[in-house]
Amino acid sequence: MHFFATDAWSQGVHHYLEHFPQCPKGRAADSELAFAVDATPAYLRKPIVATRLRDVYPSVALPHLRFVVILRDPVERLHAYWDTFVQAGVGVNDFKKWVDTTLEKVKTCQKAHGPELWPPPDTGRCDPEVIEGVAAGLYAYQLAYWFKQFTPARFLITSLDAYERAAGAVLRDVSGFIGVSAALLGTAREIGTPSDAQVVKVMGAPPPAAKEALGKFYHPHNAHLHKFLEGQPHAHCSPNLAGLGIGSWAEG
């Protein structure tokens, strides 16, 4: 429902809570109903979400929040973004043409505001939709911000690649991280097999020329992400840092 990231916020926290079952008092952690999850691709890239979380949750609850972050190759993510959200304009039916136009807009924005694109500049001199779409794949900057808000130990970082390759290990790591038994969380077959990850993928791969251009753009950012996570011993990577697959992204 994207409550913390959209105008749904104006409807108040009671509207948000109506979407979740009440948590009965005294129920054990491994009982039939022990927790609920708010999952959305919007929260990580929206700085205001962290502020709103602090506004909603009482101070005694904040230390108990846990964040599971699922990353994706930013080239594949942007391809899916184009397929879902680009409904008009240059390149609406041609991803390579859209990429060329988009990267030109990115260069123009960087000339005006410097190389960093996240958080997206809010000055009216950059195309907000284009910049936000591209900047959503700059994960290191986003994670650095969130780690300052809630500390690295409260984050488990995994990826779509990791889930496809080692679903069982990822599910075990997630269940241990949030403090429930693996049986309560469910098996990979019950939750969604690795093959089910295909539902979030665009039919067909990005054209080679578009993939190469985006790979060159994201290459230093992916390498920065890998180095950043290497320096975060308290953050949890599942199944491990190498298993996230960032190395293959950084190859461009």
Q: Which stretches of residues belong to each language-model region?
A:
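Generic structural signal for well-ordered alpha-helices
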Residues: V13-F20, A50, R54, L143-A144, ...
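PAPS-dependent sulfotransferase catalytic domain
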Residues: V49-T51, H64-V69, E76-D173, F177-I178, ...
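The conserved 3'-phosphoadenosine-5'-phosphosulfate
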Residues: R72, T123-G124, E132, A144-H224, ...
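Aromatic-acidic/polar surface patches that form glycan- and anion
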Residues: A5, W9, D30, A42-K46, ...
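A cross-domain feature marking catalytic cores of carbohydrate-active enzymes
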Residues: A39-P41, V69-L71, P207
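PAPS-dependent sulfotransferase catalytic core
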Residues: M1-Y43, A61-L65, V75-H113
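N-terminal cationic-hydrophobic initiation segments that often serve targeting/anchoring roles
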Residues: L17, P24, A28, R54-P58, ...
